[in-house]
Amino acid sequence: MFTGIVVFLIYAVVAHLFSYYFKKNRVLHSQKWGLNICCGKTDGGGVNADIVQHKELPNFRLVEDIYNLPFANKTFDCVLCSHTLEHVDDPKSFFSELERVGEKVTLVLPPLYDLFAAFNIFEHKVIFLTFKKEHHSLPLYITLPFARTLHDKWGQLNRA
């Protein structure tokens, strides 16, 4: 029993590190992004935009409403949205807005094999039903059980 728990925890940690650090960074550094939306502390090489400025980044734009971005239609050839859709109230509307401002949208999402990220009810509102990290369309998703109740009562750990 104890050995099984240890093996599970080792798997979960290794899968999370592989998914979040290796695979995410591989996508981020694969090209220069016209728009890196909800950029956090990462520089995508073009316009970096977020609802909060986490650190000094080149070409940073503060965005007030992710569902109504301050850019004209098809302003950007390529848009990167990494580890954000799982935090928002309405992933479909946000994805539609990304498609409006970008020719090609790339989503980086927590895959199901990354158990720590995929089932994180303290930060995430939805779980994407995918084993892939990178997407160009919105995959199927479901609302995480108890996440909204938890966020309403005690707040969301990381707000998007």
What are these model-predicted stretches?
Residues T3, A72, D77, L129-K132:
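Compositionally biased, low-structure terminal segments
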Residues M1-R26:
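N-terminal membrane-anchoring alpha-helices
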